[in-house]
């Protein structure tokens, strides 16, 4: 029996904690979508780490860590792996005006693979007790309340 490679897309990926769990469980990421640049940089770095580990070239990652210059974005490491590895981190805000462009990027990354699962953690401020207390009645009008609907579109 041939083992199927299970794939996922991570929406509202943050720095990739949920992705890390799925990767450790044997899933392969197709895309991580996150709006914050620092988190996207972390996603690119972790993608490079996983690629280099699979290729038996972890020493490249270790050298990067030893020689990393504070304030750099990681491009020294990212240039050591094929572009499609780091391109899996899509730095974009998910919304009506961006969704079609995101779909195009995901489709290009996906190729002929199927997506087995959509994962992600939308911003919790509008759901959490602390967030609701802080925002008061404005919580009902917070657009983050509606972000879960994008899971269906993917």
Model-derived features: positions:
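Conserved active-site and SAM-binding loop architecture
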Residues: 1-154
